[in-house]
């Protein structure tokens, strides 16, 4: 049965744009067929501990003498990686926090990006190559091409580098911009533009869920 891994990281539990959008994708995915299943991971409600040992960055065969991570931490990493490899499609809610990603999502990245296991190092193996991953990023301002603000987006580019370039996954990026226009009076003239960005994000996610779940 096709499986979706649905990951949220927003600290906002009741009015989150990224959560709403990943939920839309997951619902549309499920609508494709009763055989479609979803595994949901909430990194805010159930955060991973920060990586306990730098040795976990490497496959066991690449560790130097004396690098012996705690077996419990190693087992946790294995479970997180297995959850990712078992999925046919992945959707990740990655809201922009201080121009970067939530620390909970960074912790997850540190668990799954492992030289010699999920990332080529001494071999050319890329077990996640070609697996579709949809990055859903909400942001208070605009960082679109031509905005003059592109260089300040440290949310999407690192995820594309890790998941797409390093791990070989097939990355799609959907953004919903200007979410602060509803909150900050000085940004009120941008409300309509923000609403349009949200509508476009919803339309794109609906279509992606349909095509990836076909």
Curated annotation (Swiss-Prot):
Keyword list, A-Z: Flavoprotein, FMN, NAD, Oxidoreductase
Top-rank taxon: Bacteria
EC number of the protein: 1.6.5.-, 1.7.1.17
Cofactor note (record): Binds 1 FMN per subunit.
Catalytic reaction(s) noted: 2 a quinone + NADH + H(+) = 2 a 1,4-benzosemiquinone + NAD(+); N,N-dimethyl-1,4-phenylenediamine + anthranilate + 2 NAD(+) = 2-(4-dimethylaminophenyl)diazenylbenzoate + 2 NADH + 2 H(+)
Keyword Oxidoreductase: yes
Cofactor(s) of this protein: FMN
First and last residue of the signal peptide: none
Residues that coordinate or bind FMN: 10, 16-18
SUPFAM superfamilies linked: Flavoproteins
GO MF assignments: electron transfer activity; FMN binding; oxidoreductase activity, acting on NAD(P)H as acceptor; oxidoreductase activity, acting on NAD(P)H, quinone or similar compound as acceptor
InterPro entries in the record: Flavodoxin_fold, Flavoprotein-like_sf, FMN-dep_NADH:Q_OxRdtase_AzoR1, NADH:quinone_OxRdtase_FMN_depd
Pfam families in the record: Flavodoxin_2
Assembly mode: Homodimer.
HAMAP family: Azoreductase_type1 (MF_01216)
Function, in words: Quinone reductase that provides resistance to thiol-specific stress caused by electrophilic quinones.
PANTHER family according to UniProt: FMN-DEPENDENT NADH-AZOREDUCTASE 1, FMN-DEPENDENT NADH:QUINONE OXIDOREDUCTASE
Record family assignment: Belongs to the azoreductase type 1 family.
Protein name per Swiss-Prot or TrEMBL: FMN-dependent NADH:quinone oxidoreductase
Source organism of this protein record: Rhodococcus erythropolis (strain PR4 / NBRC 100887)
